[in-house]
Amino acid sequence: LVPFAVAHGVSAVGYALVEDARPGRFDVQAADALGVPEGPERGALQRGESVTLPDGQTITPDKVLGAARSGRKVVIAGDGSPSESVIEAARGADVLVHEATFCEDERDRARETQHSTAHEAAGVARAAEVELLALTHLSNRYFGGEVAREARTIFPNTVVPKDFDTIDVRFQERGGPQLVKGGALERRAEREAVPSGEEGQK
């Protein structure tokens, strides 16, 4: 968890949640060529541990794993005007949660109150090269649609979550982050969780 300064007129911070890097992909062909048997030895190598084979040969993870893969990164900017500190903190993030209190026609009001417009939030997301922008803290004068449309002219992969929506932060190889409508993620998890011993009753 990495805090960073946010421009809001008073002392304010945002947070970057940064996951540790993951081991590289397991190279099955390399493991086969080295004589690593299927089973716990391969699991240990995938966890980054060296193993010793029955013939005395020691296999280190770098012999069977590809380059390390980055973990996921979610940045919550909180209230504030667009700033370089947010761009730097959000660089390459999977998800940036950024306020969009106003639309661009209220930019002067946004400056007075040290908030952001949807257009500005989208500019931050584009500059930081994030994967998904989630807009929050909308003024009650908006219903969300116009805010999303304004942001998408700058950064197409923008969502405006509603109460009980969830953002499923998937790894890039599994499709990347996605907005899941209220409760759908929990319902899917419940469907997939079959209690032990009930399989034969269905």
What do the predicted segments below correspond to?
Residues 1-135, 142-149, 154, 170-202:
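Metal-dependent phosphodiesterase/nuclease catalytic metal-binding core
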Residues 139-142, 164-166:
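A short, acidic, flexible beta-alpha connecting loop/helix-capping segment that sits on the rim
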Residues 157-164:
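Conserved phosphate-binding/catalytic loops in two-lobed NTP-binding clefts
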